[in-house]
Amino acid sequence: MPAVDIPGSKSVTARALFLAAAADGVTTLVRPLRSDDTEGFAEGLARLGYRVGRTPDTWQVDGRPQGPALPEAEVYCRDGATTARFLPTLAAAGHGSYRFDASEQMRRRPLAPLTRALRDLGVDLRHEAAEGHHPLRIEAAGVEGGEVTLDAGQSSQYLTALLLLGPLTRKGLRIRVTDLVSAPYVEITIAMMRSFGVEVAREGEVFVVPAGGYRATTYAVEPDASTASYFFAAAAVTGREVTVPGLGRGALQGDLGFVDVLRRMGAEVEIADDGTTVRGTGSLRGLTVAMRDISDTMPTLAAIAPFAEGPVRIEDVANTRVKECDRLDACAENLRRLGIEVATGEDWIEIRPGTPAPAEIKTFGDHRIVMSFAVTGLRTPGISFDDPGCVKKTFPGFHEAFGELAAGWGIPLTPSR
């Protein structure tokens, strides 16, 4: 059976870099993701004075529980949301003056709930242009800790940032969450903090994080489940079979739950200890599914929805409107370009069955739009992309890996460029 080697998880790599930088000692990360986002995170750590050593398969980070080594720094976060949200939080635990900026795309993405919570904890933080957006400056003097209330209804990354900060504060944190999206990503954070020596307690909607810092370790990064979704969907939509090694029972990432959606649609799914296999059965059923907890895979499902035998309705995904682009509108626009009937609302999209026609996909610079509609291209020769290279954000080698899988199945692909 074809097996695809999926690069390391972006979300796990970003958290691991934060934890390694904050830990006491030298941490080795095994098989981290090397992409524009994670390289930007590592570059940001270096700008703050952390030492990050790299070999082809590992990164070593010299931790500094006391915070950044440099008293002043300017950090450019590129397009990375984790970089733009986690690094200012890490810097706040230190002592110095730190300025953060990001790409135009990232400047448009919201930050206000996190920066409001940091200010409530006493952090001297100032937005230099639009309130709640980059660029921003932090005059760091450590964080005392205590109680704080957070709205994480737009992004679970706000909560993750505060959870990661907790052990670096003097008193620990008690975080009351009023709303939470993509909850499985928070479970990733808590599990990884445990690997670095910190146990988070949850009391309903309150998360209690002790002070005391992190201890260095060797940490293996599992394959990216969001990236794997394109290959699983490819098998389901073509009636073929694919296995992703290293992503099986016990995986941290909630986005592996996408295979349960494929199972509901009629695909055969086998989750073993050491990997996951999806087999297409030649047909896909329509369905209605809430994807709030696995919303990064919403475009994957939208891209294969026309091939289902009935309508596909995806609900509870309002947060996808504030990603790299408005993904609900981007999916709808591109499906219409392909001749597919689509309806959308504030937090939903409904896609009717149809036969997509060749067209150029408008990517909006969003890696997930490209990778999702590449799956559509397996059944629709002639699909192309206005910016195929934006996949470098999470999987620089995507087109080659996807083309190799398709060739192994005997399916010719239109060149992406």
What does each model-identified segment do?
Residues 1-417:
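Short, structured segments at the rim of ligand-binding sites
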